[in-house]
């Protein structure tokens, strides 16, 4: 016999469902979203949620890791690179807070910089490259945005200590320096240094000379580029190996790639020219030559979906491609688009007298590579990209795939950086949608359960909490959330790409006139 359900029974069920749903709805609208969120529209709503995510994640760091250079949110603990800390996390994140208008957080960070920060520590050597792009760059952009001389004073003190690393026969910097003793004692293996590290310090040094009127930083930057562009064995190809000998100035080996140890060298070829108001410098010529080399030697496509990718040449120009691409390479779509248009809208750029087949080619390639970089996210179980992907050239696997050892995600910024640049220049809403999908995936899988903390993942193919890696990188605050926030900024007069150039750590510098009369390259 079938039991009959009365009206009273159904009413009780509806009431129970209502009682269950109301608290969930309340939590979703008041806890997960910022106040007033429902009154906002479109991009403004999304920008507000990204800002709220920054506040929550930063508050977790302030609570459990304040002042530490590294932060491990699962164990709620931090670690310093030097005994008293370097301000790694705080200074790297400072200009993001300024851009988002987080006055209270900026004030607390400033108090730490004023009262606790000292470079006079001699217990360990630090990376010249990382310290330059994150801390020197962060201080300089924070000074520009606030006009607070504290940051400029700290920048001068830091840069003077970093200059000790450039005391080599070529002027190329050693990899590490002791900020306290102003010496480099760690022997670099056979004096080999990374091409990217040597070629990604110039924007910061030149801007500091511009601000202070002291030419020594600008001269130091020029000397490094004289060496990096001066090896005749490679200069005609536009592509260079990922290692250089700081004693002889010659490139070492034949390994060419746009991933680790190569990436930002090519990025700064363009950005050094943009920083000087696209004045037709030798750096622009070198960048254009490098793009030609990338297209001739590194560019390839999958079958049948025609995903563009930038391969590696571990054996040099005369050897076979390795169909492998680091997430780091996803800086390239934005760089190509920026280089083709000089930061103006694509519509306006196409009416310029300087527009031609080269610029159209670079725009097309930027859009193709952007599609590939987004697919690196779209193809995974979590919607987040692995650190490295491979491309199937034998048509035996998926067109884009990752190996287990490369499936970790560090919440890197390169893809959202390029999405921001492509949206600003093309106004194509697809780039906002892709960026939003990536942000939502961070919310779902990088957030710690029951916490407003975010951490890296061990595997983007696992949705399990146990596969969360205990580390919040400073570039989560300095770059990833900043670029996502700016992606949904409707006012393009804020940090316009025609007047600002972002360093490789997303610190915005205003473009400058070369009034130093030091342009020696």
UniProtKB/Swiss-Prot annotation:
UniProt superkingdom: Eukaryota
Lyase in keyword set: no
Regulation: Inhibited by kifunensine.
Substrates-to-products reaction catalysed: N(4)-(alpha-D-Man-(1->2)-alpha-D-Man-(1->2)-alpha-D-Man-(1->3)-[alpha-D-Man-(1->2)-alpha-D-Man-(1->3)-[alpha-D-Man-(1->2)-alpha-D-Man-(1->6)]-alpha-D-Man-(1->6)]-beta-D-Man-(1->4)-beta-D-GlcNAc-(1->4)-beta-D-GlcNAc)-L-asparaginyl-[protein] (N-glucan mannose isomer 9A1,2,3B1,2,3) + 4 H2O = N(4)-(alpha-D-Man-(1->3)-[alpha-D-Man-(1->3)-[alpha-D-Man-(1->6)]-alpha-D-Man-(1->6)]-beta-D-Man-(1->4)-beta-D-GlcNAc-(1->4)-beta-D-GlcNAc)-L-asparaginyl-[protein] (N-glucan mannose isomer 5A1,2) + 4 beta-D-mannose; N(4)-(alpha-D-Man-(1->2)-alpha-D-Man-(1->2)-alpha-D-Man-(1->3)-[alpha-D-Man-(1->3)-[alpha-D-Man-(1->2)-alpha-D-Man-(1->6)]-alpha-D-Man-(1->6)]-beta-D-Man-(1->4)-beta-D-GlcNAc-(1->4)-beta-D-GlcNAc)-L-asparaginyl-[protein] (N-glucan mannose isomer 8A1,2,3B1,3) + 3 H2O = N(4)-(alpha-D-Man-(1->3)-[alpha-D-Man-(1->3)-[alpha-D-Man-(1->6)]-alpha-D-Man-(1->6)]-beta-D-Man-(1->4)-beta-D-GlcNAc-(1->4)-beta-D-GlcNAc)-L-asparaginyl-[protein] (N-glucan mannose isomer 5A1,2) + 3 beta-D-mannose
One of the Pfam families matching this protein, by short name: Glyco_hydro_47
Disulfide bonds: 330-373
Lumenal face residues: 32-521
Cytoplasmic side: 1-8
Gene Ontology molecular function: any one: calcium ion binding
Glycosylation sites: 114, 167, 300, 342, 378, 499
Active site: 387 (proton donor)
Membrane topology classification: Single-pass type II membrane protein
InterPro entries associated with the record: 6hp_glycosidase-like_sf (IPR012341), Glyco_hydro_47 (IPR001382), Glycosyl_Hydrolase_47 (IPR050749), Seven-hairpin_glycosidases (IPR036026)
EC primary class: hydrolase
Protein name, as recorded: Endoplasmic reticulum mannosyl-oligosaccharide 1,2-alpha-mannosidase
Protein source organism: Schizosaccharomyces pombe (strain 972 / ATCC 24843) (Fission yeast)
């Amino acid at each position: 016999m079938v039991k009959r359900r009365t009206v009273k029974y159904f009413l009780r069920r509806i009431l129970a469902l209502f009682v269950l749903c109301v608290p969930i709805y309340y939590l979703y609208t008041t806890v997960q979203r910022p106040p007033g969120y429902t009154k906002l529209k479109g991009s403004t709503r999304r920008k507000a949620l990204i800002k709220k995510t920054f506040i929550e994640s930063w508050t977790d760091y302030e609570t459990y890791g304040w002042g530490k250079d590294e932060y491990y949110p699962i164990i709620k603990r931090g670690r310093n690179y030097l005994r008293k800390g370097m301000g790694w996390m705080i200074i790297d994140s400072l200009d993001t807070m300024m851009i988002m208008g987080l006055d209270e957080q900026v004030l607390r960070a400033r108090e730490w910089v004023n009262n606790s920060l000292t470079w006079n520590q001699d217990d360990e050597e630090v990376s010249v490259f990382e310290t330059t792009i994150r801390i020197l760059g962060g201080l300089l952009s924070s000074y520009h945005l606030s006009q607070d001389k504290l940051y400029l004073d700290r920048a001068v003190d830091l840069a003077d200590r970093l200059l000790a690393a450039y005391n080599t026969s070529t002027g190329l910097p050693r990899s590490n320096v002791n900020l306290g003793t102003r010496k480099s004692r760690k022997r670099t293996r056979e004096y080999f240094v990374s091409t990217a590290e040597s070629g990604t310090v110039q924007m910061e040094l030149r801007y500091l000379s511009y601000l202070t009127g002291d030419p020594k930083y600008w001269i130091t930057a020029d000397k490094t580029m004289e060496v990096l562009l001066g090896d005749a064995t490679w200069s005609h190809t536009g592509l260079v190996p990922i290692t250089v000998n700081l004693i002889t100035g010659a490139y070492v080996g034949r390994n060419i790639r746009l991933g680790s140890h190569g990436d930002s060298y090519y990025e700064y070829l363009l950005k050094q020219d943009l920083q000087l108001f696209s004045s037709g410098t030798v750096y622009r010529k070198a960048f254009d030559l490098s793009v030609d080399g990338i297209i001739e030697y590194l560019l390839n496509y999958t079958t049948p979906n025609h995903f563009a990718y930038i391969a590696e040449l571990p054996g040099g120009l005369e050897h076979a491609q390795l169909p492998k691409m680091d997430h780091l390479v996803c800086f390239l779509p934005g760089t190509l688009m920026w280089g083709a248009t000089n930061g103006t809208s694509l519509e306006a750029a196409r009416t310029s007298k300087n527009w031609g087949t080269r610029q159209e080619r670079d725009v097309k390639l930027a859009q193709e590579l952007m599609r590939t970089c987004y697919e690196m996210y779209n193809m995974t179980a979590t919607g987040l990209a692995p650190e490295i992907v491979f491309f199937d050239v034998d048509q035996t696997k998926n067109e884009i795939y990752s190996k287990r050892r490369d499936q970790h995600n560090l919440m890197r910024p390169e893809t959202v950086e390029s999405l921001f640049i492509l949206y600003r220049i093309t106004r194509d809403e697809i780039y906002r949608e892709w960026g939003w999908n990536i942000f939502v995936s961070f919310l779902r899988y990088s957030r710690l359960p029951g916490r407003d903390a975010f951490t890296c993942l061990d595997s983007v193919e696992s949705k399990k909490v146990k596969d969360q890696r205990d580390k919040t990188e400073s570039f989560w605050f300095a770059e990833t959330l900043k670029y996502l926030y700016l992606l949904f900024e409707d006012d393009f007069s804020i940090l316009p790409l025609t007047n600002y150039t972002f360093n490789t750590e997303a610190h915005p510098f205003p473009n400058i006139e070369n009034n130093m009369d030091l342009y020696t390259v």
